[in-house]
Amino acid sequence: MKGLLKNEFLTMRRVILLYAGVLLLYYLLGVFGTKMAGVQVFSVFFCTMLVISSFSYGEKSGWNTYVNVLPVSRGQIVMSKYLFALICMAGAAAFGLLIQCAMNMKNGNPVFQDAWVAGMAVMIASLFLSVVLPVLFKVGAEKSRVVLILIFLIPFVVALLAEKAGIQLNLSPERLHSLLPAAGLGTVAVVLLSCAVSMGIYGRKEF
């Protein structure tokens, strides 16, 4: 497992550096702007693209065929993808949280004010990946582009339709903060279910 994770980071190191540069620019915009919340959410979702890119790299390099003759189980291969995604998202969230706390101290606000945003961003991004990763394991990165776009757009379409229908959702910061514990448990359950589904899909796949 450790070797698989190391391979993910070494293979994607140039892309990770590129993403880090882009995120640093956005964090600077957030620091000199008025709100960091939007930047934190964007940075976490932006990092989900890393695992999608890793699938594309694996397909083009022939890694998927090679790794299946190594002394690792298919379950470990699946878990390494999930862990890679979670580590990247957690890293982006932690860095954003650090900047948020520093800004709060500078502005005389409570240190952990709006700290919940980073956690909420990780949970939402994890739910997104819980849907995306089984699709990627099933059909691969190249064939799933349209599906990924649709999955990404569905929440926005639902929100737009709800607004047009006059449905008002109580999504105040206080309400969202109170939902964090339940949302966290639900997210863990969904991620574990997604991982099990991906293992089933990948276990039956032929190379």
Which ranges hold each PLM region?
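Short helix-to-coil transition segments within interhelical loops
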Residues: 69-74
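Alpha-helix N-cap/helix-start motif at helix boundaries, enriched for small hydrophobics
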Residues: 76-78
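Hydrophobic alpha-helical transmembrane segments of membrane proteins
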Residues: 1-62, 80-207
